[in-house]
Amino acid sequence: MELFKHTLFINLDHRTDRLAHATAEFEKMGIVAERVKAVQPKNGAIGCTMSHIKCLELAKLREYEQVFICEDDITFLTPDLFTRNLAQFVGNEDLRWDVLIIGGNNVPPYQQLHEYCARVFSCQTTT
């Protein structure tokens, strides 16, 4: 199963350790990913947000219908569960979605739609 047609991951130039980590994680999952050079202003949180926007702009420019955007510290803890849940989500034509968040802290209230997904109105991440 091809998990994602297009995958972009954000990485700072000097974080070669994280580049190696992300590369190993993608290989483990069979994902072909493209590195995007992170934006690095003085404020790291702003740089992270700007880097995500950079990825979205790149995806729009390339006319990607869907894109998986992640950071270089991504870890797939349970690859089989992730693959199974993603396949169920993508295969469910009744689900309408614009953004799929695969990791974060969901803030109530949210709707548990299925065992493998919830409709979230607020999700906290580091940015």
What are these model-predicted stretches?
Residues 1-70, 74-127:
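An acidic/histidine-cluster motif and surrounding catalytic segment
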